[in-house]
Amino acid sequence: MALPAGLRGAGMFGRAVHRVPLTVGDVLSHMDDTARRLKTVSAHLTYTTVTVLVNDRATQVGALFFRKGRRPEVLVRFSKPDTKVILFKKNRAEVYYPRINQIQEYDLERRRDLLQQFLLLGFGTGSGALEGTYHVRYLGEKPLHGTMTPVLELTPIPKDVAAQLSKVDLWISPQSWLPVQQEFFEASGDYLIASYSQMRINEPLGPSVFKIRAKHGVERVKMN
């Protein structure tokens, strides 16, 4: 059913900001409510990777498009510092590098959980799935861009996930109950911060959004 224009966007999930302390159960309950109604998300994104040993900080800026379904579809389009497009679709990933006109293809058949455990963590993830993969702890509300924001600390349970991540901090919008920031920490101390803004929720995203528009003569390379 099409939504009236006035109900589209992050505000459709808006609730009055709590005046009493939230619990982990409160946050997960709100996230479950959002997950049941979530269909699409588009947002401006900033990825910042930090390599602690050499004190290196690299930032990529772009846009995220997500359509929920039995097989979620995700397209990430980076515009700075270099143009790059990443498409996740039907247990496959494609990475397009316009400068060299090449698409690198990855088979994710054996890693179907990759999107939900990393890139889409918190986007439509129900509490059952979250607590099945992570020990969940509520860190309280912390300031982020001038807004007191609930923060969940996730510690991986499966050994294969724990081998890559020591923990994840999810900063959850108290209006949309979707992540506005994900912080992924590696055992080495290195970390990635994914920040989302200008979020638009449940607006129509057609099939054409989830396609890579490559230049003529693009080279395709299978990576696994």
Show where each model-derived region lies.
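Bacterial Sec-dependent signal peptides at the C-terminal "C-region" and cleavage site
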Residues: M1-V17
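Gly/Pro-enriched, hydrophobic low-complexity segments
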Residues: L22, Q104-Y106, L114, F118-L119, ...
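N-terminal mature ectodomain segment of secretory-pathway/periplasmic proteins
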Residues: L22-V95
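Short, surface-exposed charged micro-motifs
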Residues: A63-F65, K84-V85, H135, K167-W171
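Beta-turn initiation residues at beta-strand->coil junctions
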Residues: F78-S79, Y97-R99, E183-E186
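Hydrophobic, well-structured mid-protein blocks that either form specific transmembrane helices
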Residues: V85-G124
